[in-house]
Curated annotation (Swiss-Prot):
Membrane topology designation: Lipid-anchor
Subunit structure and binding partners: Interacts with the BAM complex by associating with outer membrane-assembled BamA. Interacts weakly with the amidase AmiC and potentially with AmiA, but does not interact with NlpD.
Lipid-bearing positions (N-palmitoyl cysteine): 19
Function: Plays an important role in maintaining outer membrane integrity. Supports proper folding and function of BamA under envelope stress conditions. Binds specifically to anionic phospholipids via the BON 2 domain. This interaction is essential for function and guides the protein to the cell division site. It was reported that DolP is a potential upstream regulator of the amidase activator NlpD. However, later studies suggest that DolP affects cell division and may impact daughter cell separation, but likely not as a regulator of NlpD.
Official protein name in the record: Outer membrane lipoprotein DolP
Length: 191
């Protein structure tokens, strides 16, 4: 049997330390997000489960699966559908499917008619979301942890638990970010 060289042992130990550090940092980040989110942990879990259930229900429809690109976001039981479909009928069917999922209290259908966007536009959307979140984070007018940001084809969608004043400020901040074509809000208002 061949023994491991001291260098192999050292490299293995360093790699394992990196894995442990990544796991600890990742767990801390998730814990911090859960702690600062205004929703209860139970509601956060319910929303995550709702997203999975809606995605699963949509993926069972062969035409939607083949012809449309739909992303699902859930917040406080409200479901936001964004993406592209070739026609209004398919978009309406996606909304009906989402409404039939247990736990979906309300469905916002923001699916646009057209061809699904490509990887380049999807990457740009991720960058826009990052810029919007950064601007919200530095704002004194909005508690950024109360706002969920989704971007699709340059359109920014905002959801969350906010005051009316925070909602206006968040929409204004998002609208000023370069690359944003439009801002749509679906907030739940708190007093």
């Amino acid at each position: 049997m061949k023994a491991l060289s001291p260098i192999a042992v050292l490299i293995s130990a360093l790699l394992l330390q990196g894995c442990v550090a990544a796991a600890v940092v990742g767990t801390a980040a998730v814990g911090t997000k859960a702690a600062t989110d205004p929703r209860s942990v139970g509601t956060q879990v319910d929303d995550g489960t709702l997203e999975v259930r809606v995605n699963s229900a949509l993926s069972k429809d062969e035409q939607i699966k083949k012809e449309a690109r739909i992303n699902v976001t859930a917040y406080q039981g409200k479901v936001l559908l964004v993406g592209q479909s070739p026609n209004a009928e398919l978009s309406a069917r996606a909304k009906q499917i989402a409404m039939g999922v247990d736990g979906a209290n309300e469905v916002y259908n923001e699916i646009r008619q057209g061809q699904p966007i490509g990887l380049g536009e999807a990457s740009n959307d991720t960058w826009i979301t990052t810029k919007v979140r950064s601007q919200l984070l530095t704002s004194d007018l909005v508690k950024s942890s109360n706002v969920k940001v989704t971007t699709e084809n340059g359109e920014v969608f905002l959801m969350g638990l906010v005051t009316e004043r925070e909602a206006k400020a968040a929409a204004d901040i998002a609208s000023r970010v370069s690359g944003v074509k439009r801002v749509t809000t679906a907030f739940t208002f708190i007093k």
